[in-house]
Amino acid sequence: MNKTEQDQLKKEAATKAAKMVEPNSVLGVGTGSTVAFFIDALGERKEREGFSLKHIVTTSNRSKKQLEGLGFKVDELADIDQADLTVDGADRVDDNLDGIKGGGGALTLEKNVAINSKKIIWIVDESKLVHHLSGFPLPVEVLPVSAEQNFKRFEAEGLKPQWRLNDEGKRYVTHYGNYIIDLAADPTPVPHGLADYLDHTVGVVEHGLFLDMCDEVIIAHSDGTIEDKKRK
């Protein structure tokens, strides 16, 4: 499948998700190539139906600029109590609809939006599907003051940590001024155990394991089909 065909599938999946958004609701919007198609589909609804939303919050400046360019007003997370629906992408999704997110470095804001949402839908293509969470480094955001100790601790646990670097080869700094340590992309058969370990590690701000959060995944398959998979 070439990129044009893949983009067409992503667009179809994103359009399906856009149809699920209720008018005058509070919407959370993630980021990524598939989410960009979702935002375009919202813009088409706005133009065609006069579609509007009560509030929109987003997890990236890129999505914010795209939404504002289509005439939507984007609010801060602090401006809302709870999103009715959040639509986002994911770096990996397993059979239980648990996922790894944060490849773009915005995992803390992504999780904040997610936990303040009544419903979460992820849009992905089939390349993101795995049986057990693996095949993509797990990002862990850490405080600079404890980063070295965290790195050594992760090494001792056999988690094969790597510093995330920017384009200049220096440590990547998040929106909140923290570092990211990427853990090994090895299979994670017990993700809840790893999440619990990270949740109780001093200096860890947030991690990219999104467990028991996603309600529905819309999957674009290479055979041209769109699958709608819901949490059991």
From Swiss-Prot:
The active site is at E110. It catalyses: aldehydo-D-ribose 5-phosphate = D-ribulose 5-phosphate. One of its GO terms (molecular function) is ribose-5-phosphate isomerase activity. One of its GO terms (cellular component) is cytosol. InterPro entries: NagB/RpiA_transferase-like, Ribose5P_isomerase_typA_subgr, Ribose5P_isomerase_type_A. GO terms for biological process: D-ribose metabolic process; pentose-phosphate shunt, non-oxidative branch. Catalyzes the reversible conversion of ribose-5-phosphate to ribulose 5-phosphate. Belongs to the ribose 5-phosphate isomerase family. Homodimer. This is Ribose-5-phosphate isomerase A.
